[in-house]
Amino acid sequence: MGLGAAARSAAQSFDRIAADYDRLGDLSENDGIMGWLVSVLPSVGGRALDLGCGAGRHAVLLAERFAHVDAIDLSLPMIEIARARRSRPNVAYRQADLLAATGSGEYDLVLSVMTLHHVPDLQAALAHIRGLLAPGGRIVLVDAYPAESAHPARRILHLLVPLRPRLHAGAVLRFRANLARRGPATAWEIYRLSIRKEWLDHRVSDRFSSREELDQCCATLFPGCQLERLGGTVVGLTWDRTL
């Protein structure tokens, strides 16, 4: 099945930064997210699905726990990096849109990390993800959800200051933090990659849903789910489907 227009646009954006994306992951892997995933993923299972797998960083974690892992991503260069760097005998990487993922009720685990802010309709995406889960299975989702309505000053700032300068300023702040945490060489490389035109172009295309939107979706699709703040606006969600 071919990609739709929105999916093609997102794929092209990722295609241009695939190597940088993977390198940044090597340099600045979010230990908070990875540590949380290790704590909430089942220790063993049958079939798992990684939606928006990127270069396979989380698929290899699933491969240690599940008999088979399907890992999909919009970007073919990302998939090629995953196959080259993180191939596992029980992981099948393929290019596909999240909304085109098939296997209704087949998966014991469905995982998505920092992918949902690229979908045009959060409710539709979450409903589709729920449909992929087998009875007794678990959904684990991670993404950023700014609470815009609680911060009117932030909305004013966003109106007055264009996104690109704000992203550049954020890279400077992270550089300062990384100097102490990772040393000058690594801090400089992270900063250099973060201010490249292709990377900033990609970041400008991000469209984050609000925390309020997430809460509304969870009330109807994932009643009783667990939500945990993992740092800043990043939220981890777990939900178990009853038998």
Map each language-model feature to its residues.
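Short catalytic micro-motifs in class I SAM-dependent methyltransferases
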Residues: 114-115
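A conserved beta-strand element that flanks and buttresses the S-adenosyl-L-methionine
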Residues: 111
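A short glycine-rich, Lys/Arg-flanked "PGG" loop and its adjoining helix->strand segment in the class I
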Residues: 124-135
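Conserved class I S-adenosyl-L-methionine
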Residues: 1-44, 46-52, 61, 78, 140-174, 178-180
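Short alpha-helix
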Residues: 205-223
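Class I SAM-dependent methyltransferase SAM/SAH-binding core
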Residues: 55-100
